């Protein structure tokens, strides 16, 4: 690989100046050797190394053509394009290697697996899975692709773990058959909602066991979905800490089921409950349950202060198809108030004897997935891909994750050197 200046922003300024170029070049070559067995051909290995180098470089646009032109010359533009769309190598062995290295770097110690989706604005209708759909980054409906991602956060750091491109339901209709073929969407692929994709990936990673997980986290878009939460296969000692919205209802006490005698008509199928559920917003506004000031954790910029309230309650679940409800499992309700008055609501299925300090810690572990997106999009060209095919998207995201792990390793290495 040709020596070049690495992007100091991607390495958060722990690298500064050309003096470290040779050191970082050697470290990168050693790091990428872990992935070389996944590429059967020498040309593939060179193209892989070149592209990762490009993602870590200061190039303004980190897509195929600028990287090829900068590092290898014009004659390598087409080979690098074909490397993404046609080159015969499998992504799964690369992902397995990446997950193993990531787990060794950050995967120890009571961490959280978080799920979230992120969107990529696209022009036109000829990219795999593109449609007008809600784009969280813009807060409105836009023409975009959406990926579902898992991240791990623990005491040793954070990183993206797994991912999948969401293909909207209409893409599986006959109307889209030619476009599916054009974008090389796998023939065996079937529609799955974002929540189904997330649930499947979470259950696979939890079963795999490479990451030491105590928590599963998600934002309210997933936490509001009871089927998603109830379908998680959580090993012993692993619990969800899920954001929900203000309208979520809980029972403050377990309701008795009453069947009043009916003098007329058929007997009642659904019971009358002795108590009704309340919204979590009402709990937040209830003065009899006071807010408490607390230091949630020690952050990089000092203590993280917050106000919070918490209580044991019972989840509220649907009972049939006619708006009847019933009490579910006993859970924690955890509310966090920010300095601007905004309140975040969380439900958690951890046991009653769990110290509340553990809930405080869990409340700080979900933000790193947003940090991963920010670092990968701002510094590593996550959204710079120009491939329209399904395979091109999959490979670009995987290479960005591989580059992100290298940046993480180097930042930690420089931190250790500076502390001695």
Residue ranges, per PLM feature:
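Short, conserved catalytic/metal-binding motifs centered on acidic residues
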Residues: 67, 109-123, 150, 216-222, ...
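Electropositive nucleic-acid engagement tracts
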Residues: 39-50, 54-125, 131, 204, ...
């Amino acid at each position: 690989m040709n020596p070049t200046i690495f992007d100091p922003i991607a390495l958060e300024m722990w690298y500064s100046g050309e003096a470290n170029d040779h050191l970082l070049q050697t470290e990168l070559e050693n790091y990428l050797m872990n992935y070389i067995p996944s590429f059967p051909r020498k040309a593939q290995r060179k193209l892989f190394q070149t592209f990762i180098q490009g993602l870590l470089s200061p190039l303004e646009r980190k897509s195929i053509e600028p990287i090829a032109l900068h590092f290898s010359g014009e004659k390598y533009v087409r080979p690098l394009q074909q490397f993404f769309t046609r080159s015969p190598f499998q992504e799964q062995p690369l992902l397995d290697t990446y997950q193993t290295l990531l787990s060794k770097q950050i995967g120890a110690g009571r961490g959280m697996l978080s799920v979230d989706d992120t969107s990529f604005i696209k022009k036109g209708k000829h990219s795999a899975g593109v449609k007008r759909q809600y784009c969280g980054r813009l807060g409105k409906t836009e023409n975009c692709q959406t990926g579902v991602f898992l991240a791990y956060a623990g005491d040793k750091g954070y990183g993206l773990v797994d991912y999948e491109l969401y293909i909207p339901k209409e893409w599986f209709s006959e109307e889209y058959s030619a476009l599916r073929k054009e974008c090389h969407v796998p023939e065996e692929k079937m529609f799955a909602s974002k929540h189904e994709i997330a649930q499947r990936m979470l259950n696979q990673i939890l079963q795999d066991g490479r990451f030491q997980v105590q928590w599963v986290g998600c934002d309210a878009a997933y936490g509001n979905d009871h089927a998603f939460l109830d379908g998680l296969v959580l090993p012993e000692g692993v619990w969800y800490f899920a954001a929900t919205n203000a309208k979520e209802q809980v029972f403050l006490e377990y309701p008795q089921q009453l069947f009043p005698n009916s003098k007329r008509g058929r007997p009642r199928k659904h019971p009358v409950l002795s108590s009704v559920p309340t919204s979590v917003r009402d709990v937040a506004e209830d003065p009899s349950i006071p807010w408490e000031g607390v230091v949630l954790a020690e952050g990089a910029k000092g203590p993280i202060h917050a106000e919070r309230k918490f209580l044991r309650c019972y989840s509220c679940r649907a009972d049939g198809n006619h708006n009847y409800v019933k009490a579910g499992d006993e859970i924690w309700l955890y509310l966090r108030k920010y300095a601007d008055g905004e309140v975040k609501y969380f439900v958690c299925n951890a046991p009653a004897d769990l110290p509340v300090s553990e809930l405080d810690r869990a409340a700080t572990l979900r933000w790193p997935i947003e940090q991963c997106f920010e670092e990968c999009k701002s510094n590593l060209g996550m959204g710079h891909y120009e491939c329209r095919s399904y395979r091109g998207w999959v490979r670009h995201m995987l290479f960005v994750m591989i580059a992100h792990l290298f940046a993480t390793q180097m930042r930690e290495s420089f931190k250790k050197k500076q502390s001695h």
